[in-house]
Amino acid sequence: NLMQFETMIMKXAGQ
């Protein structure tokens, strides 16, 4: 799922 991948990137970017 792309959503899962995007969530991971978003989390990393947020941190």
UniProtKB/Swiss-Prot annotation:
Protein localization: Secreted
Keywords: Calcium, Disulfide bond, Hydrolase, Lipid degradation, Lipid metabolism, Metal-binding, Secreted
Listed GO biological process terms: lipid catabolic process
EC code: 3.1.1.4
Catalytic reaction list: a 1,2-diacyl-sn-glycero-3-phosphocholine + H2O = a 1-acyl-sn-glycero-3-phosphocholine + a fatty acid + H(+)
Reported modifications of this chain: Contains 7 disulfide bonds.
GO molecular function: metal ion binding; phospholipase A2 activity
Cofactor binding notes: Binds 1 Ca(2+) ion.
Main location: secreted
Entry GO CC: extracellular region
Top-level class of the enzyme under EC nomenclature: hydrolase
Cofactor(s) listed: Ca(2+)
Disulphide bond pairs: none
Tissue: Expressed by the venom gland.
Function: PLA2 catalyzes the calcium-dependent hydrolysis of the 2-acyl groups in 3-sn-phosphoglycerides.
Family according to the record: Belongs to the phospholipase A2 family. Group II subfamily.
Protein name (record): Phospholipase A2
Organism annotation: Bothrops jararaca (Jararaca)
Organism lineage string: Eukaryota, Metazoa, Chordata, Craniata, Vertebrata
